[in-house]
UniProtKB/Swiss-Prot annotation:
Disulphide-bridged cysteine pairs: none
InterPro entries xref list: Ribosomal_bL33, Ribosomal_bL33_CS, Ribosomal_bL33_sf, Ribosomal_zn-bd
NCBIfam families given in the database record: PRK00504.1 (NF001764), PRK00595.1 (NF001860), rpmG_bact (TIGR01023)
Gene that produces this protein: rpmG3
One Pfam family named in its UniProt record: Ribosomal_L33
Name of the protein in its database record: Large ribosomal subunit protein bL33C
Keywords from the UniProt entry: Ribonucleoprotein, Ribosomal protein
Length: 49
């Protein structure tokens, strides 16, 4: 079952990305390095509720 999740920047708190994940294979929170337009660099983005 795939669900939509929002990824928020850990440095600015901006919610920059929306993606999907499979809850069965990835039950924990997703963390990805993505581009932050405000900081103009790649930062860690975490899954929000």
């Amino acid at each position: 079952m795939r669900v939509k999740i929002t990824l928020a920047c850990t440095e600015t708190g901006d919610r920059n990305y929306i993606t999907t994940k499979n809850k069965r294979t990835n039950p924990d929170r997703l963390e990805l390095k993505k581009y932050s337009p405000r900081l103009k660099k790649y930062t860690l983005h975490r899954e929000t509720k």
